[in-house]
Amino acid sequence: MLQGSSQHSGRDAESQALRHLQQHGLRLLAQNWLCKRGELDLVMLDGDTVVFVEVRYRKHTQWGGALGSIDGRKRQKLILAAQLFLQSESRWSSHPCRFDVVAIDGASGAEARLNWLRNAFDS
């Protein structure tokens, strides 16, 4: 039950992040893109730039919050997955790329705080 609730909250956070990014003019290229190196939550297009978006949700911030949950190992997995995406979707391989994080902290709904961090880390 807890796992289902956690997965549901994650999907809700992804939907909220997607809406927020689309309201700011980004266009969805892929969602929950899976490969042998992991998963890309959202792949968006911002003008001519391919944006790999990691969505993190934490109900409580006592252990560092959503942003604090992205460590070096997670960043490396995202970079490898992004490389595989660009190899498999060659039409985007010549475009500039960046890694963004959408961090959502707090209970879901109106009380949750969404923080969109552009260029969160370099590859």
Curated annotation (Swiss-Prot):
InterPro entries: Restrct_endonuc-II-like, tRNA_endonuc-like_dom_sf, UPF0102_YraN-like. It holds the Pfam family UPF0102. One of its GO terms (molecular function) is nucleic acid binding. Coiled coil: none annotated. It comes from the Bacteria. Belongs to the UPF0102 family. This is UPF0102 protein PFL_5073. It comes from Pseudomonas fluorescens (strain ATCC BAA-477 / NRRL B-23932 / Pf-5). The lineage of its organism: Bacteria, Pseudomonadati, Pseudomonadota, Gammaproteobacteria, Pseudomonadales.
